[in-house]
Every structure is written in structure tokens, then in C-alpha cells.
Amino acid sequence: MDIYMQYYDFIIDSLSKNPSYVCTRTARQMSVATDSVAYYHYLVLLAKAYMFKSEMDSAKLSMDRAEVFCDGAEPSSLINDLYAEIYNMRGNVCVRQGLTDSSVVCFQKAFDYRLKGSNRDMLHDISINLADAFVRTGHYDKGAMWYRKALSYCDSLKIPEEKRFPVYYGLAQVYMELRDFTSCDHYYELAARQYDKMLPFEKHIYLNNRGNSYYFRADYPNALEFFRKSLLLARSYPDMIFEEHLTEMNLGETFLLMNQVDSAAYYLNLCSDFFRSIENQTALYYLDTQLIELALKQNNLSLARKRMSEAIQPDYVEPNMQHIRNRYLQHYFEEVGDFKQAYYYQMENQRIDDSTPVSYTHLRAHET
């Protein structure tokens, strides 16, 4: 395992910058590995590289092989460490595919296995992943609680300040969801101090989410500024395909809200095929929402109706995305003169808005 850990420390910064290189080097390491546990750690690392290349089927196959090994092995702290890596990776793949509830289950299992393992140095990372997942499910109080736990682990593990920025931009996301933009900006500023030390995918998270924070306060010029930086970053790395198309979708909606219909159509068209190819349900729900509104702004009611009938409906939808869909459906029914249905979607959004103070109260209770 010592050889694997040395290799991991050497290669980890290349994971998001050049996952193809990581695949090649890791396969070479696997061919000479003599320790079976280390071999399957290499395999999980290979799965991470496949995920960054958006090759989800290959990532799943690698994780399945590693889990079969664990299931047949004698229980031990080393096997628990490997289980933790597998379930953390499964959670990350679920996030990429928009399977929000499943990601919570996987990250919780990863955390539980890590507690029973021999390497607790990654507890803060898994805590951050679990916090992110709870925020996506709308459980902002639980998300904030896990971010605070991550900070506590950072303290006990003596993680330096320059490596704590994922917690800060995570907390910023919580406050963005609650529309407390003063606290949101405070935590984004803390994260921004370490921007030069972030890996490319971390820079993308910061830029994209900070752009979203301006989107939600209807400051579209500032949102565009951050989304454009995010797109430029993603296009600088050939394997950041997911990040590139996610940013294109955000640009598309921002232009839509600015009534720049041609630019909106251009960016939404760029990202459509990719998200359909990986079957990311959350992204497709979001994309379908934008395409409905785009048809309305193009004065094409029949196309809007067609897109509504074909739009996917995931088992779970994040409150923000439901709010956006409801707003555009209200617009559609106003256009066709069905004011009863338009009023229904207006009231649904009022219900979502009314739930935010309750979430904020729960969050404050956890902080005190």
C-alpha cells in the first residue's frame, strides 16, 4: 500500500487536468502491483479518471470489479478503506448523472466505512461530498451541518487554511439557496483567496456556482462574467467535457433571461446532445425547461407544447429547478389563455418561496 499511496500523492493533481494520462499511468501501475488491495485501489483511481473523462460505463465497471473483490475478502480496516473509496466514487458518479438521492446513500456509506477504516485523513473530503449532496436535495440544514463537520475534521487533521476552500464555497452555496447573499458573498470571498491553488475542476465549481449566485439575484451581467470565465477554463482542458457543457447550459439560460434569444439557442444547442448521451436526468430536466421557454420567446406555441409533452420528469427535482420550471409553465399557460393553470404554477412557486424561511430557521438552529 505504501507504493500506492506514493503514486496517489504523485498523480492526484493530474486527475482533473489530464485524466487520459492518469488512465495510462495507472494501468501501468496495476500491471506490476503485487498487493491485491493496492491493485483494487488503483482500479478505483482508474474509475475516477474515467469519470473525469465522462466515460461513466467504464467507471461503473471498474467500481463493480473492486466491490466484488471487497465482498469476497476477509473483513479488515484496509478493506473498509477500499469500500469507502468505492462508495465515494459511486456517489460522485451519481452526482454526474443527476441521481441525487442515490448520491446521499453512497456518500453516507463511504463515510461509515471510512470511520471503520485505517485512513481517516479523507473524512473531511467525504463530509464535504455528503454536505453537497444534502444541499442538492434541499436539506440545507443538514448540508450546513456536514460542512461544519468538515471544518472540524480539518482542524483535527491540521488541514491548512489554503485547502479549506471547498468548505467555504459549499457554505456559500447553502446561503445562496436561502437567498442570504451577504453570507453567500462572505464565504465566496474566503474561497476566492485560494483560487490560484485550486485544481481546474475546483476552479470550475467556484466560477460556475458564483455565477449562479448572481443569476439568483437577477444580476445577469455579473452572472455572464463568471460563466464566461468558467467556459474559458473548461475549454482549456480537453477532458473537462461535463464542465464545458454545464456552463453552456447556464449561459443559454442567462441569455434567455436577457431576451438574447439567438445566443440562448446557440448555447442550449451546444450542450443538448452531450447531456442526452450521458442520461443526466437533472441536467435534462433543466435543459427541457429552457427549451420550453425558448420556444415561447420564439413565439412558437406548438413547439413549446411539444417540448412540454416530451420533457422528462425525474423522481426528484431540486427546489430551484422546480421553481424555474414552474415560472416558465406559468408563462406558457398565460400565453395560451389558461389562467387557472397559470395561477396554479404561480401558487406552487409561492409555496416553494414560503419554505425558505423554514429552512433558514433550521439552519440557524444547527449553528447555535
Feature locations, PLM:
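Alpha-solenoid helical repeat architecture
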Residues: M1-D2, T34-H41, E74-E85, G117-D125, ...
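Amphipathic alpha-helical segments of tetratricopeptide repeats
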Residues: A27-S31, E67-P75, K109-Y113, K149-S156, ...
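Hydrophobic positions within repeat-based interaction scaffolds
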Residues: D57, D101, S302-R305, S309-E367
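Coil residues (strongly favoring Ser/Thr
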Residues: D13-S14, S36, D57-S58, R65, ...
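Single-residue signature of alpha-solenoid repeat helices
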Residues: S20-V22, A59, S103, G143, ...
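Start-of-domain marker
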Residues: M1-T26, V32-Y40, F52, D57
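Conserved alpha-helical positions within TPR/SEL1-like repeat arrays
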Residues: V44-F52, D81-R96, D121-R136, K163-E177, ...
